A protein has these predicted regions:
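Catalytic cores of RNA-modifying enzymes
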Residues: 1-110
Length: 110
């Protein structure tokens, strides 16, 4: 199902994608196969450790421990967002992305 969703998106091999909340890495696995670079911001420390262990030998991924709402979005290059985000912070995340100095080219929320 995830590969179908990504396949229907406008994400391609030259893209830089930010994934908000990598969780167990199911979406991440698909993104690293397609994208030039993937940034995963994970708030839960145990899931962060899991992602670091799972993707330790992958060169096109950067896993960041922290709160996406405090994460500084890129200012000088284009990027896309692909994420499955919690309902209770959806409005705050969309507001941050919409009003960013350099908003994302595309936003995919599942």
């Amino acid at each position: 199902m995830v590969s179908d969703l990504i396949g229907e998106s406008n994400i391609c091999k030259d893209d830089i994608v930010i994934e908000i909340g990598g969780g167990r890495g199911i979406i991440t696995e698909q993104l690293i196969e397609i994208c030039r670079e993937v940034y995963v911001i994970e708030y839960d420390f145990n899931l962060y450790k899991h992602l670091k262990d799972k993707f330790y030998n992958i060169n096109n991924i950067k896993i960041i421990y922290g709160d996406f709402l405090e994460f500084e979005l890129p200012k000088e290059y284009k990027y896309k967002i692909f994420s499955s985000i919690p309902y209770n912070i959806t409005a705050a995340i969309l507001s941050k992305l919409t009003f960013a100095d350099n908003p994302p080219e595309d936003i995919y929320i599942v």
